[in-house]
């Protein structure tokens, strides 16, 4: 299946790139990528192939300053990227929702789950909660 990339403008006027396969499933899997990663990475595309093979809705996106989204990476913050993840979650959630977060995306997934009862599953892949403290202390 051809993956057509779309863009949505968020509350910060960023044009955020995303792909949603909308297979009319009652389950949606969301992929939250890591710092400086984009939605064309190995994990994101492998999940895309698996969800399409199994008839499950799938949303992947680029945070501002990442991949095909607008913005400057150096102006990003965890709070800003959390808001972007929540923006997509609210727009594309279904009856059952599973978030898979990789690295920084695992941290953002945890923060999203703390604020939202519509999440039925959470998977962290090499989750990096509070990785910024270690990076800035160097």
Give residue ranges: language-model regions.
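N-terminal cap/lid segment of alpha/beta-hydrolase-fold proteins
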Residues: 1-24
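Short beta-strand element of the alpha/beta-hydrolase
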Residues: 26-34
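Short substrate-entry loop that stabilizes the transition state in hydrolases
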Residues: 35-42
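Conserved alpha/beta-hydrolase
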Residues: 44-70
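Catalytic nucleophile-loop/oxyanion-hole region of alpha/beta-hydrolase
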Residues: 66-92
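Short beta-strand immediately N-terminal to the catalytic nucleophile in serine-hydrolase-like folds
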Residues: 99-101, 125
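Gly/Ala-rich beta-loop-alpha elbow adjacent to hydrolase catalytic centers
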Residues: 101-109
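Hydrolase active-site cap/lid region
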Residues: 115-138
